[in-house]
């Protein structure tokens, strides 16, 4: 199944994972999970090392063409295509966002969170997040 990619990366494009689902995610018969605006996510959530970035880079363009600002919500990943929609979870907080940049460039980490994503997740700076990749939308969502 192809990765679901959004048509545009929005600087404040995060969608609370609970939006429209009452905080619940369901598991479909094919093993995928649903949640956050009708997206269907790969399941189960997978752990990944993460850091955050931003200070000193604000005003610069990301690899995906956005201008990075303190409130920009998104993630950097080395190989996932720009615009790939992800659900990211950390210690009871979660959000749905997109890949907007390339990185991280520190060994052992899979994601760099923007400051806006870090704040939305109450992320402490370095740690393990859990993620799932959007693989489509439920019928009738959009």
Spans of model-derived segments:
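Secreted/periplasmic proteins
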Residues: 1-142
